[in-house]
């Protein structure tokens, strides 16, 4: 929640549900999908920038292709450059996401580019009084992005190793243990462990870095003359009027005026969002599994098939 004056923090989901219901009644069903177009554009722009920089410099775009410390540092530098370039457009996308549909005109699909370029042109001295120059936002945004990325990769690898170790220990006690299994063989169970580790790491990163994102989002929104829905009532709108000088000033002001819980404003919305993500993943996995079973030729399972389905643990 980017507004610092709201009384309801909505740290748990159930306090947010009545407000969301009122927003739906007063607006329309798309109120929770605001900014989805610009968000997708910014994500696509990020991938495009990474691809261009990678092809221009020869730096690895994927961390799995890093075979040395130098290549790892090049990969991290590529990520930093990409995040820095898209920061102005991320700011524009964030405004579209949080602004009220009642008090603001609905943005066109490509307005994110116009607003992003405007912030680049106002690099040093923004035309709007309280807006921070984009260079003052780039460093904390890049720092958050790269730290979150490295933490995600690290936790994912650790989780994957733990899950494989648990499964390996379980199957070593069974008759299916076979050390001569081909390590290069593809197995859907390996992919299942990788998916679970990726989901767990993603959820953990969203929760851990939520307070930092709250601060950075407030810096992005400051001075943009954005009017947001009043989430205390769900029936009115309020402007965002802040005057932070930077990341630490925003952090200290939040702690002083709102307490530590002010860093977790809107955490209940994140819980609902993650629950929706898990539901979609579960539903998609179920549908794909059912379709795969329907397309498979009828075949009675054998003990050999069962053994092969478990040997993936020893690669």
At which residue positions do the language-model features occur?
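Matrix-facing interhelical linker segments
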Residues: 1-315
């Amino acid at each position: 929640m980017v507004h610092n004056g709201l009384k309801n923090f909505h740290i748990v989901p159930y306090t947010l549900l009545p407000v969301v219901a009122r927003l739906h009644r007063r607006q329309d069903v798309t109120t929770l999908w605001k900014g989805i177009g610009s968000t997708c554009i910014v994500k696509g722009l990020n991938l495009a920038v990474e691809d261009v920089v990678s092809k221009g410099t020869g730096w690895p775009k994927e961390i799995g292709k890093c075979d040395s410390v130098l290549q790892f540092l090049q990969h991290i530098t590529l990520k930093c450059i990409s995040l820095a370039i898209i920061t102005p457009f991320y700011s524009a996308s964030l405004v579209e996401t949080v602004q009220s549909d009642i008090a603001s005109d609905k943005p066109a699909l490509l307005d994110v580019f116009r607003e992003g370029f405007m912030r680049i042109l106002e690099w040093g001295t923004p035309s709007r009084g309280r807006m921070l120059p984009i260079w003052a936002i780039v460093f904390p945004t890049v720092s958050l992005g790269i730290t979150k990325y490295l933490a995600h990769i690290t936790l994912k690898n650790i989780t994957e190793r733990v899950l494989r170790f648990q499964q390996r220990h379980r199957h070593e006690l069974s008759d299916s243990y076979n050390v001569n299994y081909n390590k290069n063989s593809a197995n859907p169970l390996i992919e299942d462990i990788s998916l679970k580790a990726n989901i767990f790491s993603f959820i953990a990163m969203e929760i851990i870095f939520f307070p930092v994102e709250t601060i950075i989002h407030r810096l992005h929104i400051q001075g943009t003359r954005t009017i947001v829905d009043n989430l205390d009532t769900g029936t009115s709108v309020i402007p965002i009027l802040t005057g932070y000088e930077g990341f630490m000033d925003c952090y200290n002001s939040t702690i002083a005026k709102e307490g530590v819980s002010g860093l977790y404003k809107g955490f209940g919305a994140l819980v609902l969002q993650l629950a929706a993500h898990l539901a979609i993943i579960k539903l998609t996995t179920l549908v794909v599994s059912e379709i795969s079973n329907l397309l498979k030729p009828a075949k009675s399972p054998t003990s050999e098939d069962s053994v092969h389905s478990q040997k993936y643990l020893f690669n």
